[in-house]
């Protein structure tokens, strides 16, 4: 794979930066809009019954620790649909980003990230660009080098302990951390592993990494021309990379 030179922001978009975008444009995020059943039902298996109208209200998924071990294939055990949760109220009604303006913005859909990037006269990176940026130009295993994860609690914000019920918080953060809280990689980029997931412009296609090597070098790949997730075949998805404060070796590693 070959890519042309490109610029990338030093850190994830903070609440302060996203607030500037909202103030300037009046943009309303996906999580702040009531759900249009006619729009969403085409992303679900045929025959899925319509939920009650009081469920189809503006909201987002909020993480809650479980009381003990659960099936890690069943994310409904720890992700809970919460009406009123959005970027200004990350944990739902009654929560606030006050005191967290330097934290990365959360509850941001692909459409929201794309809209912010356009407003800022930028764009989302391709997955290939993101991968190169995360590498820091090295062949190291992690953005911080080759130190194993258990010895890297001062290098990135991720889950220490047993997911999703025992977080030892050895890195000092049970949730998001302010941007630039941990050391940068060799390119000077922060949080290329951990803290929050980061959007790429590519469509998600499970077959993206299979290609005919006889074609030689692929220049500036920008992903598949189709959405392809056999687990949720009707849902259009885009690539996210980098992991988050909820990731550890047992989950999303």
Regions found by a protein language model. Give the residues of each.
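Short capping motifs at secondary-structure boundaries
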Residues: 6, 21-30, 120-121
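N-terminal segment of the mature folded domain
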Residues: 11, 31-32
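Functional-site microenvironments in short loops/helix caps that host divalent-cation chemistry
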Residues: 34-39, 43-253
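Short, solvent-exposed alpha-helical surface patches in non-cytosolic proteins
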Residues: 10, 15-22, 109-115, 131
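Short secondary-structure transition/capping motifs
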Residues: 7-10, 76
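A short N-terminal beta-strand-loop micro-motif at the entrance of redox/enzyme domains
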Residues: 1-5
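Hydrophobic pocket-lining residues within nucleotide cofactor-binding pockets
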Residues: 6, 13, 245
């Amino acid at each position: 794979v070959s890519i042309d030179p490109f610029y990338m922001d030093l850190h994830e978009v903070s609440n302060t930066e996203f607030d500037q975008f909202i103030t300037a444009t009046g943009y309303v995020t996906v999580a702040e809009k009531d759900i249009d059943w006619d729009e969403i039902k085409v992303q679900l298996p045929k025959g899925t019954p319509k939920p009650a109208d009081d469920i189809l209200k503006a909201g987002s998924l909020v993480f809650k620790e479980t009381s003990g071990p659960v099936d890690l294939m069943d994310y409904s055990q720890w992700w809970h649909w919460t009406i009123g949760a959005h970027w200004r109220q990350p944990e739902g009604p009654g929560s606030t980003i006050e005191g967290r303006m330097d934290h990365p913005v959360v509850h941001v859909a692909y459409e929201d990230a794309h809209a912010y990037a356009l407003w800022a006269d930028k764009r989302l990176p391709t997955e290939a660009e993101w991968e190169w940026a995360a590498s820091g130009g090295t062949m190291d295993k992690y953005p911080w080098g080759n130190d194993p994860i258990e010895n890297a609690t001062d290098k990135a914000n991720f889950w220490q302990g047993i997911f999703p019920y025992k977080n030892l918080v050895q890195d000092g953060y049970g949730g998001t951390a302010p941007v630039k809280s941990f050391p940068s990689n060799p390119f000077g980029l922060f949080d290329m592993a951990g803290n929050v997931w980061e959007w790429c412009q590519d469509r998600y296609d499970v077959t993206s990494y299979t290609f005919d090597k006889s074609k030689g070098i692929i220049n500036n790949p920008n992903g598949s021309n189709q959405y392809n997730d056999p687990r949720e075949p009707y849902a259009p998805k885009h690539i996210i990379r980098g992991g988050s404060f909820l990731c550890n070796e047992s989950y999303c590693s």
